[in-house]
Regions:
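Auxiliary tRNA-acceptor-end handling modules of aminoacyl-tRNA synthetases
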Residues: 1-10, 63-64, 68
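Short clusters of hydrophobic/aromatic residues that line enzyme substrate/ligand-binding pockets
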Residues: 5, 54-56, 295, 304
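Positively charged, Gly/Ser-enriched RNA/tRNA-binding surfaces
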Residues: 12-27, 38-41, 69-71, 79-95, ...
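Glycine-rich, histidine-containing beta strand-loop boundary motifs that form or position
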Residues: 33-36, 162-164, 399
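Glycine-rich, mobile lid/loop segments that gate access to catalytic sites or pores
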Residues: 159-176
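Short, solvent-exposed helix-helix connector turns and helix-capping sites enriched
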Residues: 164, 191-194, 224
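Acidic, His- and aromatic-enriched active-site or binding-groove loops in soluble protein domains
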Residues: 52-66, 175-203, 207, 286-288
Length: 445
């Protein structure tokens, strides 16, 4: 449940994080990192109470220590949205609104470990929050940014499912369901426990048979485009909140009409278990890997930062970085040939060439090219084998002087040619590596 990647895997994970960061910044989101702990009272008040929160305590604290009691009120955050809301309230006077931030940070949940579910994990979140009112167009922008970001990663295509909690809540209220929040949480479990499981749980919540059947009619509507809204209306349930949700969903789907077919679909089964979501909600899954569950999710909230002096509505999404890279590595969906960021290994075949090897190494590093130098003379085969084993693309053989210049060997092709450390550039770079990985992912996806 606490993944530790090999160096070649960690390189891929960092490249994915770098690409996510770059895409977030293209849309004007600013970087942020919040503390790892939050008051337990804050963490447990935001829904999903079945999530196991890790409590922070001091092992050496005495039973009568007031500090120990204070520590017991702290827990590790299980997502990044709750800490973000607390941060906004705390720094309200120092922020410019609408406030747009991204976080790529760890979270912790005491879940049963399995593929795609970890007790310690990395998430990449974006949120935008404003005073009093947040434009609905931000809901569509979140989906567009998600699509563009995930399309740039070395993963199979992702379908983003969209719903609006006002639809689900308004529909249940139109059915005269007495307590809609527990019913919504149950409906959100459809993909995990199936229609029969949902029916049994709703029966236990004292819903009538007619209410249960009608609720299942809603969440089992086939996902699709704007036509899904018409199918909901055909069910004949009426409520003002339902009408508001359908209008908002129609607006978002219209805004996203230029995305590739299948990139974003309306799906009535997406409810989201967190109580703070009040409008648009999203979940995305990799095509051909739906068994993994959602690789991104999020939604709109109207009351999350309730401690602020004014109402602060917002909308945000989260990408499950650890879930994505865990599947990539488990299914060999992305190449991991390089165990180091090193581009060049400078060889030292004999002691008298050490000075030249040092000059080359320093010159390449000064130009921003990651470079290692072999530290003691040894057989060239040994040095070249080291470069090959670590996936270093180039080996640099220092020349003996004016009559013999430097040589650079391409470790993949075996080709070699003259090298000048003041001008030479590697033919491979991170962008090329990502491009190759993307092609391979598409072939497998």
């Amino acid at each position: 449940g606490f993944p530790e990647w090999l160096p070649q895997q960690r390189i891929v994970e960092l490249e994915i994080q770098d690409e996510i960061r770059r895409r977030f910044e293209l849309y004007g989101f600013a970087p942020l990192e919040t503390r790892s702990v939050e008051p337990l009272s804050v963490l447990v008040a935001k829904g999903e109470t079945d999530k196991e929160i890790y409590v922070v305590d001091r092992l050496a604290a005495g039973t009568a220590s007031p500090e120990r009691d204070a520590d017991r009120r702290l827990g590790l955050h299980y997502d990044l949205t709750v800490p973000f809301a607390r941060y906004v309230v705390q720094h309200y006077n120092e922020l410019d609104f609408p406030f747009k931030r991204y976080q790529i940070q760890r979270g912790w949940r005491g879940e049963r470990p399995q593929e795609g579910r970890y007790r310690e994990f990395v998430q990449a979140d974006i949120d935008v929050i404003d005073r009093d009112r947040l434009a609905l167009s931000f809901d569509a922008e979140m989906v567009r940014l998600l699509h563009e970001t995930l399309a740039a990663l070395p993963i199979p295509p992702v379908t983003i499912a969209i719903n609006n909690r006002k639809i689900t809540e308004g529909y249940l209220r139109g059915l005269d369901v007495a307590d809609v929040i527990p019913a919504m949480r149950i409906l959100d479990k459809l993909d995990k426990i199936g229609a029969d499981g949902v029916r049994r749980m709703l029966d236990a919540e004292a819903l009538t048979g007619a209410q249960v059947s009608a609720a299942l009619e809603l969440v089992t509507i086939a996902p699709g485009g704007r036509e899904v809204i018409g199918r909901v209306e055909e069910l004949g349930v009426r409520h003002a909140l339902l009408d508001d949700g359908l209008a908002e969903l129609a607006f978002v789907m219209d805004e996203l009409s230029t995305l590739p077919a299948g990139a974003a679909v309306a799906n009535m089964a997406i409810v989201r278990g967190f109580d703070y979501y009040t409008g648009s909600v999203y979940e995305g899954s990799m095509r051909g890997h739906e068994d993994l569950g959602a690789v991104c999710s999020g939604g709109r909230y109207e009351n999350l930062a309730a401690g602020a002096r004014v109402r602060l509505p917002g909308v945000g999404v989260s990408i499950g970085v650890s879930r994505i890279v865990g599947r990539l590595f488990a299914r060999d969906l992305v190449p991991t040939p390089r165990k180091t960021p090193t581009e060049v290994l400078v060889l030292v075949p004999e002691e008298r060439l050490r000075w030249r090897a040092q000059e080359v190494t320093h010159a390449l590093r000064e130009r921003g090219i990651p470079t290692e130098m072999w530290h003691e003379p040894s057989k060239l085969n040994k040095q070249l084998r080291y470069a090959d084993n670590k996936g270093i693309p180039y080996a640099w053989l220092p020349g003996r002087g004016d009559d013999e210049g430097d040589l650079v060997r391409d470790m993949v092709s075996g080709d070699q040619g003259a090298g000048d450390p003041s001008a030479w550039l590697p033919a491979t770079d991170r962008a090329t590596a990502r491009s190759r990985a993307r092609v391979r992912a598409e072939e497998r996806g």
